[in-house]
């Protein structure tokens, strides 16, 4: 684990990191999020019966748009020229009464650049989850968004990171 916060200067003030001297490398990051819901809500999504429209298509586009706007949402993020943004959604019915029905969201962002795309991947997964909540809140308000996390990142000075299985 790094022991220095890169966005804090010697005076303790928040600053945008200067990446101008860094070499361009291919960088990629994957993130995930889950939306837990009632079986009836998941069935509305899967069957395409949600009155607001195609939940997965809307969440996918929202996640892609969010990744592209991360620099506008997170104050010290750099505007990036993303070469790839992918958002995948999977309906996961509960296997037994001890589990919940859920949607798993996985995002992937990629570029050739001077800074990483972890925040873009996390933002894509988060906003896709929020969009699912928004589109389904009329039928269920107690859905839970959980486990928003970075799964893997490659490229850059810190190298390869992957969550242990």
Swiss-Prot record:
Q: What role does this protein play?
A: Catalyzes the conversion of (8S)-3',8-cyclo-7,8-dihydroguanosine 5'-triphosphate to cyclic pyranopterin monophosphate (cPMP).
Q: In which pathway does it act?
A: Cofactor biosynthesis; molybdopterin biosynthesis
* Keywords attached to this entry: Lyase, Molybdenum cofactor biosynthesis
GO annotation, biological process: Mo-molybdopterin cofactor biosynthetic process
Which HAMAP family does this entry report, sorted A to Z? MoaC_B
Q: What is this protein called?
A: Cyclic pyranopterin monophosphate synthase
Q: Which domain of life is it from?
A: Bacteria
Reaction equations catalysed: (8S)-3',8-cyclo-7,8-dihydroguanosine 5'-triphosphate = cyclic pyranopterin phosphate + diphosphate
Where in the sequence is the active site? 134
Q: Which residues make up the binding site for substrate?
A: 76-78, 119-120
What binding partners and quaternary form does the record give?
Homohexamer; trimer of dimers.
Decide whether keyword Lyase is in the record.
yes
Q: Which InterPro entries match?
A: MoaC (IPR023045), MoaC_bact/euk (IPR047594), MoaC_sf (IPR036522), MoCo_biosynth_MoaA/MoaC (IPR050105), Mopterin_CF_biosynth-C_dom (IPR002820)
The EC number(s) attached to this protein equal 4.6.1.17
- Cleavable signal peptide: none
Organism annotation: Photobacterium profundum (strain SS9)
Which molecular function term from Gene Ontology is one that the record holds? cyclic pyranopterin monophosphate synthase activity
Q: Which family does it belong to?
A: Belongs to the MoaC family.
């Amino acid at each position: 684990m790094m022991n220095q916060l890169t966005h804090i200067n010697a005076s303790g003030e928040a600053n945008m990191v200067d990446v101008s001297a860094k070499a361009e490398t291919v960088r990629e990051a994957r993130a995930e999020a889950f939306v837990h819901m009632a079986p009836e809500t998941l069935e509305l999504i899967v069957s395409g019966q949600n009155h607001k429209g195609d939940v997965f298509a809307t969440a996918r586009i929202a996640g892609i748009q969010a990744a592209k706007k991360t620099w506008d949402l997170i104050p010290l993020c750099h505007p990036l020229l993303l070469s790839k943004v992918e958002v995948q959604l999977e309906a996961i019915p509960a296997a037994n009464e001890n589990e919940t029905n859920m949607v798993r969201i996985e995002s992937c962002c990629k570029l050739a650049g001077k800074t990483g795309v972890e925040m873009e991947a996390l933002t894509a997964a988060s906003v896709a989850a929020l969009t699912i909540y928004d589109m389904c809140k009329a039928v269920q308000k107690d859905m839970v968004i959980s486990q928003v996390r970075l799964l893997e990142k490659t490229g850059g000075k810190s190298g390869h990171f992957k969550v242990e299985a």
